[in-house]
Amino acid sequence: MAKIADLTAKTDDQLAQDLGELKREQFNLRFQAATSQLEKPSRVKEVRRTIAQIKTLQTQRAAAAAK
């Protein structure tokens, strides 16, 4: 799981790219779970939380830019 300090150091473009990659990974993990091929079930939780952290950072930055 990514540290929040690592995420805050990234630019908006890097965060958007990471978000896309994580969503693809989440999609693949869902299919692996459905077919009982998932090796690390904890990875689903990690990916979900990292996506939430990135979205939170993007929202905070958008709110700060709007002020």
Curated annotation (Swiss-Prot):
Cellular component, GO, one term: cytosolic large ribosomal subunit
Any one GO MF annotation of this record: structural constituent of ribosome
One GO-annotated biological process of the protein: translation
Pfam families in alphabetical order: Ribosomal_L29 (PF00831)
InterPro entries: Ribosomal_protein_uL29 (IPR050063), Ribosomal_uL29 (IPR001854), Ribosomal_uL29_CS (IPR018254), Ribosomal_uL29_sf (IPR036049)
CDD domains in the cross-refs: Ribosomal_L29_HIP (cd00427)
Keywords associated with the record: Ribonucleoprotein, Ribosomal protein
Family indicated by similarity: Belongs to the universal ribosomal protein uL29 family.
HAMAP family: Ribosomal_uL29
UniProt-listed PANTHER family: 60S RIBOSOMAL PROTEIN L35/50S RIBOSOMAL PROTEIN L29, LARGE RIBOSOMAL SUBUNIT PROTEIN UL29C
Identification of the protein by name: Large ribosomal subunit protein uL29
Organism: Rhizorhabdus wittichii (strain DSM 6014 / CCUG 31198 / JCM 15750 / NBRC 105917 / EY 4224 / RW1) (Sphingomonas wittichii)
Gene: rpmC
